[in-house]
Amino acid sequence: MKVKEEDKSLWCSSLGLNIRSLRQATNVREQLCSLTEKHHIPVVTDPSLSSMERKRNIKRCLCQGFFMQSAIYDRDGFYLTAKEAQRARIHPSSSVTTPCHWVIYNELVETSGSFIRTVTQVEGKWLAETAPDYFYLTSFPEGRMKQELIHLYQELLL
């Protein structure tokens, strides 16, 4: 049975889901499935992992590809992008509605202000472990981001 586009949009809205992001996720999934088939890579799911562990693993994988597009919560609903320290808000179309300490994002857009889109909450330590050369302290100017990284590295050493 084919579902009307309008019905899909209404269903997503009723659940607080972003239809654009779901389409993008479906497209990425189809591409990954196609690549695994093409290269004869078996797709294995560990049945012993809980749903929470699988989500964590997916987020850690996303950190591998998006560490350069990370940001930390600043204040008043704004985030600071990692290297540029540009202040931006989470785009209103995002399903992330509560402040998260660290996030990764797919794009930074300039409209009536600066917004980050396709946002995922992550842990700072995942970013530091994934890309230690990128998050090397001497490459950051003095400021909020550097202070957060110092605090993060101190926690990792404990």
Give short role names for the model-derived ranges:
Residues M1-Q154:
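Second RecA-like catalytic domain
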